[in-house]
């Protein structure tokens, strides 16, 4: 835990964190899990199914970015830490348990669905915490400067990820979830700013022209206006093309 700010001292101004496009996607996943849990507790299979399918669509994009870019990047700077920790194998476990939920959705027995989903949820929440513990410290080793790390995120994650047919949808979904539900430690406006500002700093001008309108229409207007004024979200992407 960081030291408390002394009385009368100004808090350090926030800085853009490009790797937050991965970290705060975890918070969108956690928000989706909370919505699914509430739907199951209410016996609302329709809402549960809608939120489950949305989360799985977003998770597929996020996992592909990890499988095709993030794990190899961090293994290279962390002496194989991601592979040694079994993170890629955990993705296979996650997919196996998710298939069990998909099968249970066709079963009229709500208890069977709750059982299958609880097994997936417990594994997935553990996986998110495991990834954060292993991966987040390694991100600082990818380049010596914030600008260098932003370029790494652009080259290894944003540009390849943006080739996915669902990437634009993914950006909108993450912003929607964060701006309405926040994170486990951040209120909605902060969680949203961390993700969107990080994405802007890891995008070329052309990419940000593509992503910014998606983020804006996925965010409550008053929140977007405040963030745009405070953090220059209406200016261009920060990676030189």
Model-derived segments and spans:
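Small-residue-biased structural context
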Residues: 1-241
């Amino acid at each position: 835990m960081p030291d408390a700010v002394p009385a009368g001292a100004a808090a350090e101004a926030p800085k853009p964190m490009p790797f937050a496009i991965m970290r705060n996607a975890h918070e969108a996943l956690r928000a989706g899990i909370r919505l699914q849990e509430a739907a199951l507790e209410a016996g609302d299979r329709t809402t549960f199914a809608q939120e489950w399918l949305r989360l799985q669509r977003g998770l597929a994009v996020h996992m592909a970015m990890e499988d095709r870019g993030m794990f190899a990047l961090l293994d290279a700077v962390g002496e194989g830490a991601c592979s040694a920790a079994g993170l890629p194998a955990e993705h296979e476990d996650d997919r196996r348990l998710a298939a069990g939920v998909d099968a249970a959705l066709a079963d009229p027995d709500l208890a069977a669905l709750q059982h299958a989903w609880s097994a997936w949820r417990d594994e997935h929440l553990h996986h998110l915490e495991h990834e954060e513990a292993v991966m987040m410290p390694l991100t600082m080793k990818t380049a010596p400067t914030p600008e260098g790390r932003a370029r790494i995120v652009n080259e290894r994650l944003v540009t390849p990820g943006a080739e996915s047919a669902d990437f634009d949808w993914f950006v909108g979904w993450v912003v929607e979830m964060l701006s309405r539900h926040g994170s486990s430690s951040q209120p909605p406006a902060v969680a949203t700013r961390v993700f969107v500002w990080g994405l802007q700093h890891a995008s070329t001008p052309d990419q940000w022209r593509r992503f910014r309108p998606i983020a804006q229409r996925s965010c409550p207007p008053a929140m977007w206006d405040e963030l745009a004024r405070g953090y220059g979200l209406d200016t261009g992407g920060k990676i030189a093309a």
